[in-house]
């Protein structure tokens, strides 16, 4: 057993003994539930922080606070609640039983304090401890006692401790909540209706991904956690709800990375009588307004870059982006869509770029892999990439001028995809054929190919109006707004392998 563990175990034993003493001598004080808080720390700081010492003395303002003890320096305590920190002072008036109980306080305990508000000689607000109650005894010490909570894995496994001691972590999740609220408000103002669609699907669909499989006992059948809500949302558009959106979780049985968590949050929306260009315009308006609302600016730092959310964003086709970021590759510079349609040409090109090939890859998949390998990470500023091939866009409408590609875009910021949108395929016969092609791809070994959904075809046969739809990755968007570079830092409880 290490010295660190021995010291921690000793402290835990001491704290348990203190709690047992309270239970024995005054059981009602072990875990009381009657304390009434009148103010949060930030409220007191905002209302009285600018007062002079003399003015506060004359005011004789009484308050009741509650929170966690974060520091204990002689007669002063630093108490933290959800809004911030404030001090409490246990001076000469603290005598007898109150003094004894104060001396038994440990860092991490949750307490309530009542008393008059004062200003210290250093200009800090504090509450004079005229009444005090231990509300919860913390049996484990906070990690500052043991060199701080610096281990990333421990931060993710014990997020509750991370939130107690790391202000940056708390602020990131506060910002996440604000981003989601701002998106929801924006959509409602644009007359979108928020809906909820099934989380368990009989047929997984709406995206190319490997699903999680579960079993419905009562129906004795396999079901799938949803990989996307798309097909259900478009059924609602068929039903006459012309603008719908949903903010909820998707599940994809794939790997973990700084950009991927198997359980993640998406905002997906659909609007009738619109196309993919309308979606790009709406995205520019949405992100610019949200950045201004939450940050007070349309510019924000991200790593060593400054991302600009104001104004119009760059728009490039996938082929144009590949050519832009491979200026010295003569083959790429001369490449045309006719060559992109040649699978042997594309396999040779991808191989020459060091890309490990899969036998079942189509021309579109090869083009996407080349884009991902040579261009994607260079898209730091907000950029719409258009011209996605039809064979990797089974739900998107074909382009009128080039049926090899679709009216689809993906939206990139900070070198990663944040959103995906397109004019929806509303030709039931074309959709039927594309679903069948996906089944063939799955049979050829593509685990992420889509399933055939006969009921969705039936819905399309009732008539889907011209529609555009988009999904925005909330987690990746929050990474930008919080200047963090791993998705685990913006998911409260990310997926982790169980500890042995």
From Swiss-Prot:
Q: Which UniProt keywords apply?
A: Aminoacyl-tRNA synthetase, ATP-binding, Cytoplasm, Ligase, Magnesium, Metal-binding, Nucleotide-binding, Protein biosynthesis
* Reported cofactor(s): Mg(2+)
The biological process GO terms on file are:
lysyl-tRNA aminoacylation
Pfam (any one): tRNA-synt_2
The residues that the entry says bind Mg(2+) 2 are 417
- EC class name: ligase
- EC number in record: 6.1.1.6
Q: Describe cofactor binding as the record notes it.
A: Binds 3 Mg(2+) ions per subunit.
Keyword Cell inner membrane recorded = no
Q: Name one GO cellular component term.
A: cytosol
In which domain of life is the source organism classified? Bacteria
**Which GO-annotated molecular functions does the record name?**
ATP binding; lysine-tRNA ligase activity; magnesium ion binding; tRNA binding
- Annotated residues for binding of Mg(2+) 1: 410, 417
Task: Describe, as the record does, how this protein assembles with itself and its partners.
Answer: Homodimer.
Q: Which family does the entry's similarity section mention?
A: Belongs to the class-II aminoacyl-tRNA synthetase family.
What protein name does the entry list?
Lysine--tRNA ligase
Q: Which organism is it from?
A: Shewanella frigidimarina (strain NCIMB 400)
């Amino acid at each position: 057993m290490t010295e660190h563990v021995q010291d921690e175990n000793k402290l835990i034993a001491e704290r348990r003994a203190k709690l047992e003493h309270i239970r024995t001598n005054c059981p009602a004080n072990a875990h009381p539930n009657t304390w009434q808080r009148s103010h949060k720390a930030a409220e007191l700081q905002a209302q009285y922080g600018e007062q002079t010492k003399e003015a506060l003395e004359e005011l004789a303002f009484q308050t009741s606070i509650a929170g966690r003890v974060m520091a204990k320096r002689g007669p002063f305590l630093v108490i933290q609640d959800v809004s911030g920190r404030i001090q409490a002072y246990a001076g000469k008036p603290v005598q007898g039983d109150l003094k004894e109980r104060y001396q038994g306080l440990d860092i991490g305990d949750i307490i309530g304090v009542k008393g008059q508000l004062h200003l210290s000689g250093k200009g800090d607000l504090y509450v004079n401890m005229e009444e005090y109650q231990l509300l919860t005894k913390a049996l484990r010490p906070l990690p500052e006692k043991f060199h701080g909570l610096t281990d990333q894995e421990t931060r993710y496994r014990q997020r509750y401790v991370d939130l107690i001691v790391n202000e940056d972590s708390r602020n990131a999740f506060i910002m996440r909540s604000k981003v989601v609220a701002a998106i929801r408000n924006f959509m409602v103002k644009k007359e979108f209706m928020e809906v909820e669609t099934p989380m368990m699907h009989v047929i997984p669909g709406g995206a190319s991904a490997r699903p999680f499989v579960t079993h419905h006992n009562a129906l004795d059948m396999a079901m799938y956690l949803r990989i996307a809500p798309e097909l259900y949302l478009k059924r609602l558009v068929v039903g006459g709800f012309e603008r719908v959106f949903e903010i909820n979780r998707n599940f994809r049985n794939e790997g973990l990375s700084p950009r991927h968590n198997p359980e993640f949050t998406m905002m997906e929306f659909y609007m009738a009588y619109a196309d993919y260009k309308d979606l790009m315009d709406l995205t520019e308006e949405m992100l610019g307004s949200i950045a201004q609302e939450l940050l007070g600016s349309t510019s924000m730092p991200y790593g060593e870059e400054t991302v600009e959310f104001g104004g119009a964003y760059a728009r490039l086709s996938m082929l144009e982006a590949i050519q832009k970021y491979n200026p010295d590759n003569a083959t790429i510079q001369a490449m045309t869509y006719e060559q992109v349609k040649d699978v042997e040409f594309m396999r040779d090109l991808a191989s020459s770029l060091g890309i490990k090939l899969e036998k079942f890859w189509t021309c579109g998949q090869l083009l996407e892999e080349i884009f991902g390998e040579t261009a994607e990470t260079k898209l730091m500023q907000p950029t719409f990439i258009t011209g996605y091939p039809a064979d990797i866009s089974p739900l998107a409408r074909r382009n009128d001028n080039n049926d090899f590609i679709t009216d689809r875009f993906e939206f990139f910021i900070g070198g990663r995809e944040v959103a995906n949108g397109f004019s929806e395929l509303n030709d039931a016969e074309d959709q039927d054929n594309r679903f069948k092609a996906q089944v063939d791809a799955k049979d050829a070994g593509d685990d992420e190919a889509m399933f055939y959904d006969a009921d969705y075809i039936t819905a399309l046969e009732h008539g889907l109006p011209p529609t555009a739809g988009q999904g925005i990755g909330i987690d990746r968007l929050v990474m930008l707004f919080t200047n963090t570079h791993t998705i685990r830092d913006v998911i409260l409880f990310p997926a982790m392998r169980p500890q042995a």
